[in-house]
Amino acid sequence: MSGLMFRFPFRRFVATMPDKTKYIAKSGTYPKGFLINGVSSGVKAKGALDLTMLVSEKPCNAAAVFTKNAFQAAPVRVSRETLQQTKGQGIQCLVVNSGCANAVTGSGGVQDARLITALADKAVLGRGDGGLPSTLVMSTGVIGQRLKMDKISSGVMKAIEGLGSSHEHWMRGAKAICTTDTFPKVVSQEFSVNGQTYRIAGLAKGAGMINPNLATLLGFFATDAPVAVEAVQQILREAVDKSFNAISIDGDTSTNDTIAFLANGASGGPEIDVSSPAYEELKQSVTGIAQKLSQLVVRDGEGATKFVTIRVRGAATEADAKLVAATISNSALVKTAFFGEDANWGRILCAIGYSGAIVNPKATSVSFVPADQTESLRLLVLGEPQNVDEERASEILSHDEFGLDVDLGSGNHETVSWTCDFSYEYVRINADYRS
């Protein structure tokens, strides 16, 4: 066999990258009593924005959810420690840097994160040593490198000088937390609870290492509604479960994931706790904005050309529904088929089958759903393969947005998740990340 060379046909697929600038917020409605700024500290090259500071004029009730990765980054450990010490009360500042993750940096990295907290507490609030901390910290970027604290320290002071509440200030804050993101992610809205109008805004960064249970995903929400600390914690957990924990880009889970929620009550009104009639209304508003923000993260997936909504119905349990959705979302074979606009639905069934959920093949149905919500294209009905119109399948998959519907026929539980495709560009971005 030596000396023989076999040539196989190779179909090179070239997809047009969708225009993502349409997702950039042109204006916003922002919560009272919060100031923000994004600056260049010098951690990133060429003067790129790399440090964001959010300050509340009033003490906030706050909560956060963190990565489940065993190698939790120093800022994750320090922010978790701060929330435990303060019981989520009295938080007034948030500092986020990009370009260096301060992860797997040992005790020195933890000391650096604590130093940022102390620096912000003193510079913004005039607090010296001895009191409880009031600043949360987040970092994102390359793992295994220590922060350049001289640059971070000067960046904090620089950010303080330019704090403001305009749309431009919020956009600068969003840009400064980005790494491989192609656009800043800002969502804001007004909402009413018991006739009282409040505002909420959210920022997030993330384009790679995104997987349910959080990933290289940083974000925070700020509202001027008066929310009890227990309600802040519960609302954030439930909102994240239906948003950031329901997305996937590449199946990797980072060391730095953090989503925080701060409520300063600057707009007044009675405090909302878990037993208040307004609690459910508030939770729905926060969940809605969390879903919008998390979907922007998927739309900005590294090299992504497709945004796919995966709906799983008829599961025996909610856990089974989530398991099937997550397995499909993370399948490299499914995602590459989406990129190639190839209706290779066998890959989808394969993922469903190995998901670990209770699956009855004879009860399972699968369909592609067009973006315009016209008639679905049935691929499998009660375990029986359909005569698939390949031309229509290709037409559905040619759009930059479509859906996949899975009915397991085993119960009445359902879930929805969002994912994207894998393109050549994803490989290029991650192969060159440190260069």
Curated annotation (Swiss-Prot):
<dbReference type="InterPro" id="IPR002813">
    <property type="entry name" value="Arg_biosynth_ArgJ"/>
</dbReference>
<keyword id="KW-0028">Amino-acid biosynthesis</keyword>
<feature type="site" description="Involved in the stabilization of negative charge on the oxyanion by the formation of the oxyanion hole">
    <location>
        <position position="140"/>
    </location>
</feature>
<dbReference type="InterPro" id="IPR016117">
    <property type="entry name" value="ArgJ-like_dom_sf"/>
</dbReference>
<protein>
    <recommendedName>
        <fullName>Arginine biosynthesis bifunctional protein ArgJ, mitochondrial</fullName>
        <ecNumber>2.3.1.35</ecNumber>
        <ecNumber>2.3.1.1</ecNumber>
    </recommendedName>
</protein>
<dbReference type="Pfam" id="PF01960">
    <property type="entry name" value="ArgJ"/>
</dbReference>
<dbReference type="GO" id="GO:0005759">
    <property type="term" value="C:mitochondrial matrix"/>
</dbReference>
<feature type="binding site">
    <location>
        <position position="205"/>
    </location>
    <ligand>
        <name>substrate</name>
    </ligand>
</feature>
<feature type="binding site">
    <location>
        <position position="179"/>
    </location>
    <ligand>
        <name>substrate</name>
    </ligand>
</feature>
<feature type="binding site">
    <location>
        <position position="302"/>
    </location>
    <ligand>
        <name>substrate</name>
    </ligand>
</feature>
<comment type="function">
    <text>Catalyzes two activities which are involved in the cyclic version of arginine biosynthesis: the synthesis of acetylglutamate from glutamate and acetyl-CoA, and of ornithine by transacetylation between acetylornithine and glutamate.</text>
</comment>
<keyword id="KW-0012">Acyltransferase</keyword>
<feature type="active site" description="Nucleophile">
    <location>
        <position position="216"/>
    </location>
</feature>
<dbReference type="GO" id="GO:0004358">
    <property type="term" value="F:glutamate N-acetyltransferase activity"/>
</dbReference>
<comment type="similarity">
    <text>Belongs to the ArgJ family.</text>
</comment>
<keyword id="KW-0511">Multifunctional enzyme</keyword>
<dbReference type="GO" id="GO:0006526">
    <property type="term" value="P:L-arginine biosynthetic process"/>
</dbReference>
<keyword id="KW-0068">Autocatalytic cleavage</keyword>
<feature type="binding site">
    <location>
        <position position="435"/>
    </location>
    <ligand>
        <name>substrate</name>
    </ligand>
</feature>
<dbReference type="GO" id="GO:0006592">
    <property type="term" value="P:ornithine biosynthetic process"/>
</dbReference>
<dbReference type="InterPro" id="IPR042195">
    <property type="entry name" value="ArgJ_beta_C"/>
</dbReference>
<feature type="site" description="Involved in the stabilization of negative charge on the oxyanion by the formation of the oxyanion hole">
    <location>
        <position position="141"/>
    </location>
</feature>
<comment type="pathway">
    <text>Amino-acid biosynthesis; L-arginine biosynthesis; L-ornithine and N-acetyl-L-glutamate from L-glutamate and N(2)-acetyl-L-ornithine (cyclic): step 1/1.</text>
</comment>
<feature type="site" description="Cleavage; by autolysis">
    <location>
        <begin position="215"/>
        <end position="216"/>
    </location>
</feature>
<keyword id="KW-0808">Transferase</keyword>
<keyword id="KW-0055">Arginine biosynthesis</keyword>
<comment type="pathway">
    <text>Amino-acid biosynthesis; L-arginine biosynthesis; N(2)-acetyl-L-ornithine from L-glutamate: step 1/4.</text>
</comment>
<keyword id="KW-0496">Mitochondrion</keyword>
<feature type="binding site">
    <location>
        <position position="216"/>
    </location>
    <ligand>
        <name>substrate</name>
    </ligand>
</feature>
<feature type="binding site">
    <location>
        <position position="430"/>
    </location>
    <ligand>
        <name>substrate</name>
    </ligand>
</feature>
<dbReference type="GO" id="GO:0004042">
    <property type="term" value="F:L-glutamate N-acetyltransferase activity"/>
</dbReference>
<comment type="subunit">
    <text>Heterodimer of an alpha and a beta chain.</text>
</comment>
